[in-house]
């Protein structure tokens, strides 16, 4: 590096290149002498180059402006960084306040036990009873019989049932005492089989109530009411008014007779084909007949009467006198009860011959009626 001193005339023309070169100078010192400005510069060059005239005051002012601007920018940058750090930093005390609020599961009381004895079904039955208790009162308070003193005492169901052996015993609520707004159930130990049976009945009852709430009737759920038959040996068979003679005398006759032979009661539901194919066909059969019904031709009514008479002939040998409800104009129910079985072989043979004769006589009467109708038409 060479130290070069250049004396510049204050009245001097400079081009753009000289002005650009001036910006590369590093000013170390300057002073006034006879109205002229002396500028010392450090420049890595071998010869003197023309430099534009610059006042010392302007250079110093520019340097101050650049220095102040740089300092201000650095200060603003540090302040922005500090604010960012403050935003992202959360004190431990505030972290506790910003945690997700509790959903209540941590404070939910236990309403079941983890059993070590008994089958899964027995454990489910016991926990079902526990949930019933907690529905009556939140604390799970029950009345039980003290095995030592044989006296009633109040305790917690979880404590009392904790040591229960489900292979031998189960829980059952036998009574409920009302106290203000809550109830205290009386719980007793029962045999494991009894507890399982009670549990199954409760589940069936809940399922039935759910189906009823969804709009399903007792007929569709299989529930028996006061108007239904109290016996379980009842079979329901549908017979369409449009059935052919071949199907009636073969497939349908075999289906009816086989059930009567087994000792079942049989209800024959006769209605139109479309009505019997509905999902609620049993309700349509038992509901009251509508006031306005479609009229059928005489030929259609004769066909329906023929089906009823033919069914009576088919079941005569195996059924007692059938009970008929309804009308051939709309729908009809034929209720059949099986005949008692003869105890001796001779009685069975005689009964069979008698039924055969009765069937033959009915068939002859039917043919006579048919001939009579044909003669009247001619």
Swiss-Prot record:
Predominant location category: mitochondrion
Domain of life from the UniProt record: Eukaryota
Location of this chain's protein in the cell: Mitochondrion
Transit peptide, UniProt annotation: 1-18
UniProt keyword terms in alphabetical order: Mitochondrion, Transit peptide
UniProt xrefs under Pfam families: mIF3
Keyword Mitochondrion: yes
Extent of Basic and acidic residues compositional bias: 343-367
Single GO cellular component term: mitochondrion
Stretches the record annotates as Disordered: 339-378
Family label: Belongs to the AIM23 family.
Official protein name in the record: Altered inheritance of mitochondria protein 23, mitochondrial
Species name: Lachancea thermotolerans (strain ATCC 56472 / CBS 6340 / NRRL Y-8284)
Gene label: AIM23
């Amino acid at each position: 590096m060479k130290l070069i001193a250049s004396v510049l005339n204050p009245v001097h023309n400079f081009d753009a290149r000289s002005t650009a070169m001036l910006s590369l100078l590093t000013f170390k010192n300057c002073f006034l002498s006879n109205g002229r400005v002396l500028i010392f510069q450090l420049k890595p060059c071998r010869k003197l180059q023309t430099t534009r005239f610059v006042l010392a005051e302007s250079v110093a002012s520019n340097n101050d402006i650049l220095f102040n601007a740089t300092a201000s920018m650095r200060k603003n940058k540090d302040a922005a960084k500090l604010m960012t750090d403050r935003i992202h930093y959360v004190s431990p005390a505030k972290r506790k306040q910003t945690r997700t609020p509790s959903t209540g599961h941590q404070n939910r009381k236990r309403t079941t036990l983890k059993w070590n004895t008994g089958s899964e079904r027995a454990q489910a039955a016991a926990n079902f009873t526990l949930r019933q208790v907690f529905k009556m009162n939140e604390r799970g308070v029950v009345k039980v019989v003290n095995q030592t003193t044989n006296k009633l005492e109040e305790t917690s169901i979880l404590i009392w049932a904790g040591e229960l052996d489900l292979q031998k015993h189960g829980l059952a609520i036998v009574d409920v005492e009302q106290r203000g707004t809550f109830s205290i159930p009386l719980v007793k130990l029962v045999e494991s089989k009894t507890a399982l049976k009670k549990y199954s009945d409760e589940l069936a009852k809940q399922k039935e109530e759910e189906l009823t709430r969804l709009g399903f009737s007792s007929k569709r759920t299989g529930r028996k009411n006061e108007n239904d038959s109290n016996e379980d040996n009842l079979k329901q068979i549908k017979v369409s008014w449009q059935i052919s003679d071949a199907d009636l005398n073969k497939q349908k006759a075999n289906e009816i007779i086989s059930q009567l032979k087994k000792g079942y009661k049989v209800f024959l539901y006769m209605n139109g084909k479309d009505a019997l194919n509905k999902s609620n066909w049993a309700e349509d059969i038992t509901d009251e007949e509508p006031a306005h019904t479609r009229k059928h031709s005489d030929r259609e009514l004769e066909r329906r009467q023929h089906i009823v008479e033919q069914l009576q002939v088919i079941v005569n040998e195996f059924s007692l006198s059938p009970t008929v409800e309804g009308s051939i104009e709309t729908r009809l129910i034929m209720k059949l009860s099986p005949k008692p079985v003869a105890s001796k072989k001779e009685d069975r043979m005689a009964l069979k011959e008698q039924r055969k004769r009765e069937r033959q006589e009915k068939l002859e009467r039917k043919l006579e009626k048919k001939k009579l109708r044909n003669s009247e038409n001619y």
